[in-house]
Amino acid sequence: MKTIIKNAKVITMNEARTIHEHGYVVIEDGVFTAIEHGEPAEEAAKGANVVNADKKWLMPGLINTHGHTGMSLFRGVSDDLPLSKWLAEHIWPLEQKLDQKAVEAARLLSMVEMIESGTTTFLEMYHLHLDDFAAAVEEAGMRATLMRSVIGLCSKEEQEEKLAESLGFARRWHKQANGRIQTMLAPHAPYTCPPDYIERIVEAARQEGLPVHMHLAETRKEIHDYMDEYGMHPVELLQERDLLSGTEWLFAHGVHMHEQHYELLGAHQAAVSHNPKSNLKLGSGIAQVASMQKHGIVVSLGTDSVASNNALDLFEEMRTAVLLQRGINEQADIVTTWEGLNMATSNGAKALRFANLGTIEVGQQADFIMLNPEQAHLHPSSQAVSHLVFAAKGSDVTDVYVQGAPLMKDKQLLTLDKERILKEANEQLRRLQQ
């Protein structure tokens, strides 16, 4: 059925940066078939589902390119620690207690939070109960890139078992749910996967035609320890083993790198998921996004898990990313307002290798959100792009659509039972802490 959303301010995020102050969009079979200024013709609207946006702002759905929704019960569980202690002393021991019910509760909680704050697409890097989650994503109507991450600090036999699990999941779910679910392979990090194991995973990814996702250079300690063991930075080792070329890489973090490393990643069309709030909370440092951009790296945004953030609000992430770069570089135009919005939308689509996504254009997937501009912090309302980056909040989002199907309308979730999910999340955490 044709759907028309009319009476909206349409922020297209196309290359021309077109904004229709009073416009409408037409959606058929999950894609945009028209984006126009003014009102739809009476003939065109005949037989269509016409939605009056009532002057809301309509923009592409936000895209979260790095996270661990399975950890969402751990929100606020352990603060004020660096990454290494946070993981070893708190998170990993808690993860040993996770079972299917707890992980399901965590993930459903995350999907509620993401939809309510305008995220339509996300990446999940985790190792537990992925098939159940893929089915839940399909039912909830979201778009996702999912992967069974692997840690290689084990025997070669166990390494191969983990890789086989990862490949099996990737094959089962790649391009499923009407193309809304894609998969990757995911060595956890250079410090948890020996070089030979990463090489084996990359070889498998090349054979399967799958991208690879990995944590990279998140903390200074990680890099110092790695160089003590291998005599070089992990990016240099990847290059020495010819693992950067012929592989679609998406790296998370990339905080502790130098110009030569950015140059290598840019030369091999790698993408980076910048997670500024998580990096700040854990005291990991500030990634040099401006240097990444200079070398042609596609920089997108991720939240990491709520255990280290503590929210999944990409508006907060966008704002933090732009402001940090201006502050550390003492330059007000080094990451522009438009570039900040791009990181949360079209660059996210590129990083996850989703075609026809991330902008409001004819032929693009109809993943979009609407915000209520009738908020004091969004007025005067003439500078919408500036407000979206520097003032908007996830709570301003009122409507969320994926492939033209509504997941939330007028702040009401349509595919998830929020009341039940919140109750279950609290019950599961209490059970784990007993």
Curated annotation (Swiss-Prot):
Enzyme Commission number(s) from the entry: 3.5.4.28, 3.5.4.31
Textual note on the cofactor: Binds 1 zinc ion per subunit.
Organism of provenance: Shouchella clausii (strain KSM-K16) (Alkalihalobacillus clausii)
Catalysed reactions, semicolon-separated: S-adenosyl-L-homocysteine + H2O + H(+) = S-inosyl-L-homocysteine + NH4(+); S-methyl-5'-thioadenosine + H2O + H(+) = S-methyl-5'-thioinosine + NH4(+)
Designated name of the protein: 5-methylthioadenosine/S-adenosylhomocysteine deaminase
Annotated InterPro entries: Amidohydro-rel (IPR006680), Deaminase_MtaD/DadD (IPR023512), Metal-dep_hydrolase_composite (IPR011059), Metal_Hydrolase (IPR032466), MTA/SAH_deaminase (IPR050287)
Cofactor requirement: Zn(2+)
Coiled-coil region: none
PANTHER family in the cross-refs: AMIDOHYDROLASE-RELATED DOMAIN-CONTAINING PROTEIN, AMINOHYDROLASE SSNA-RELATED
